[in-house]
Amino acid sequence: MPIAIIGAMEEEVNLLRNELSERKDTVIANYHFYEGLLNSVPVVILKSGIGKVNAAIGTTLLLDHFKPSSVINTGSAGGFRAGLKVGDVVVSTEVRHHDVDVTAFGYEYGQVPGMPAAYTADPKLIATAEAVIERMDAIRVVHGLIVTGDSFIHDTERSNLIKTNFPDVAAVEMEAAPIAQVCHQFDVPFVVTRSISDSADEEASLSFDEFLEIASINSAKMVMEVVRTLADSE
């Protein structure tokens, strides 16, 4: 079974896609999938599009059609943890929705009814990422909580609200939680690796445009090393 790699934007999948050998392109319901060998390892790459619904639909099609052994979600994110800089990579320990509120009925903030409050990344995939970290001196990598919502966070008020609800948050983005939720439903292990493109503040949009390429390159490098290490361990 292939390893699945999901990125929302062209910039987030382009480097990985260009590294594929024996490439085969498939379009299902306007979602683009790219099969091939990445460093001799079978993979399938999905360009999901931006946002939670796009990510959920694309991931469902991916898992149902291609039957991957595991899922790696890559791309960019806004940095929340103190000390995080543009280009640093956050590896998920768990993923949550930051824009779901059904607390009136006894659920945790961010919890979708009938679903877990948090989606825990696969221990083997986290351990693999840790092994990769030791070999990547040029890229700073940290672990932590990644939260997801259907908004690009670019103001202090919303940043502070997220920090209030999730004090341990490391990064914020727009696709990881639905990807993790679909993986949970299909019982497929996942991990999220996101490179910091901005600080989720008033300068976020300018920073994102300027540093998206750096963030995408660093996240892609991390994914390629994780894929190689997973293959070597089997």
Curated annotation (Swiss-Prot):
Q: What InterPro entries does this protein map onto?
A: MTA_SAH_Nsdase (IPR010049), Nucleoside_phosphorylase_d (IPR000845), Nucleoside_phosphorylase_sf (IPR035994)
- Molecular function GO terms recorded: adenosylhomocysteine nucleosidase activity; methylthioadenosine nucleosidase activity
Q: Name one Pfam family in it.
A: PNP_UDP_1
EC top class, in one word?
hydrolase
Q: Does the keyword Transport apply?
A: no
Q: In which pathway does it act?
A: Amino-acid biosynthesis; L-methionine biosynthesis via salvage pathway; S-methyl-5-thio-alpha-D-ribose 1-phosphate from S-methyl-5'-thioadenosine (hydrolase route): step 1/2
Q: Which domain of life is it from?
A: Bacteria
- UniProt family annotation: Belongs to the PNP/UDP phosphorylase family. MtnN subfamily.
What name does this protein carry?
5'-methylthioadenosine/S-adenosylhomocysteine nucleosidase
Which species is listed as the source? Exiguobacterium sibiricum (strain DSM 17290 / CCUG 55495 / CIP 109462 / JCM 13490 / 255-15)
Q: Specify the taxonomic lineage.
A: Bacteria, Bacillati, Bacillota, Bacilli, Bacillales
Originating gene:
mtnN
